[in-house]
Amino acid sequence: MEITSYQVEWIRDPFQILTGKRYEFMLDLNIDEEDDLYTPNGVYIRAVYSVDGEQGKLVTYDLLEKGTDRLLEFDLEDEEEQELAEFCSQHWNEAEE
């Protein structure tokens, strides 16, 4: 999985219902034409990452088609999901609060 660009934003929780902080990632991917995920428009991931104290975890993610925002009915492989979680753990602190 090759991430070509990304954005990260802190998700405001004005009522502080959830513990910790949540961050939304939008990650553009470069997908090989032979891959099942490939679409001519391109693919991006919308991921939510949670940080509570020293602990961080990937809460959820969706694979979407660029341009249409159509939800793709695929899951990442375990290795790719770990790679996504690691990427988020390294970049969540770039969000402005």
PLM feature segments, named:
Residues 3-5, 39-46:
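Short, mixed-charge, low-aromatic patches
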Residues 15, 30-43:
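Short, cysteine-centered beta-strand-loop-beta hairpins and adjacent loop/turn segments enriched
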Residues 21-31, 45:
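A short beta-strand signature
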Residues 46-97:
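Acidic, low-complexity intrinsically disordered segments
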Residues 19-21, 41-43, 55:
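A short, structural micro-pattern
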Residues 9-11, 28-30, 64:
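A structural detector for beta-sheet-dominated domains
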Residues 1-17:
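Short amphipathic beta-strand and strand-loop transition segments with alternating hydrophobic
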